[in-house]
From Swiss-Prot:
Catalytic residues (positions): 8, 67, 139
Location in or out of the cell: Cytoplasm
Gene, per the UniProt record: ruvC
Domain of life: Bacteria
Cofactor annotation comment: Binds 2 Mg(2+) ion per subunit.
Name of this chain's protein: Crossover junction endodeoxyribonuclease RuvC
Pfam family, any one: RuvC
Task performed by this protein: The RuvA-RuvB-RuvC complex processes Holliday junction (HJ) DNA during genetic recombination and DNA repair. Endonuclease that resolves HJ intermediates. Cleaves cruciform DNA by making single-stranded nicks across the HJ at symmetrical positions within the homologous arms, yielding a 5'-phosphate and a 3'-hydroxyl group; requires a central core of homology in the junction. The consensus cleavage sequence is 5'-(A/T)TT(C/G)-3'. Cleavage occurs on the 3'-side of the TT dinucleotide at the point of strand exchange.
Annotated Gene Ontology cellular component terms: cytoplasm; Holliday junction resolvase complex
Taxonomic lineage of the native organism: Bacteria, Pseudomonadati, Pseudomonadota, Gammaproteobacteria, Alteromonadales
Residues binding Mg(2+) 2, per UniProt: 67
């Protein structure tokens, strides 16, 4: 039984989602957004660090997963996004959590089945997968998608490693 914290980083809005995994079942624990205020980037980064640190204290996750930086519309946006990711990753590292990173395409593929899914499709599938009464807001849904992607990736690796070491009729499978 593992608790996974997924994060969708942003310099203005950072989404988070927490799921608990029991066998093949994924249970929703919580989600939301850290909304930063002000124009001072160092202050916004501190707000992200403090927010993620508080979520870690509240939910006590075993694992941390975050979306990788994608190619932004301009260099300044990409740099700010990278710094927001860094603040979240440092919060996880301070809490001694293992950090996993996934591309947007990997996340959408794990949740929807196609790497080119739209935000609305991700929201809908997260609602269905986690049996939520309503679709979560976009940033929180993306963060829950990161957590679900991490869970599925781990399940696949466990299955593959199990098969690779299982000997049947004198052959390895």
């Amino acid at each position: 039984m593992a608790i996974i914290l997924g994060v969708d980083p942003g310099s203005r809005i950072t989404g988070y989602g927490v799921i608990q995994c029991q066998g093949r079942q994924q249970l929703y624990l919580g989600s939301g957004c850290i909304r930063t205020s002000g124009e001072d980037l160092p202050l916004r980064l501190k707000q992200i660090f403090d927010g993620i640190s508080e979520i870690i204290r509240q939910y006590q996750p075993d694992e941390f997963a975050i979306e990788r930086v994608f190619l932004a519309k301009n260099a300044d946006s990409a740099l700010k996004l990278g710094q927001a990711r860094g603040a979240a990753i440092v919060a996880a590292t301070v809490a001694n959590l293992p950090v996993a990173e996934y591309s947007a395409t990997q996340i959408k593929n794990a949740v929807v089945g196609t790497g080119r899914a739209k935000k609305e499709q991700v929201q809908h599938m997260i609602q269905q997968l986690l049996k939520l009464p309503a679709a979560p807001q976009a940033d929180a849904a993306d963060a829950l998608g990161v957590a679900v992607c991490h869970y599925h990736t781990n399940q696949s690796l466990v299955a593959l490693s199990g098969r690779a070491t299982t000997r049947t009729y004198g052959r390895y499978r």
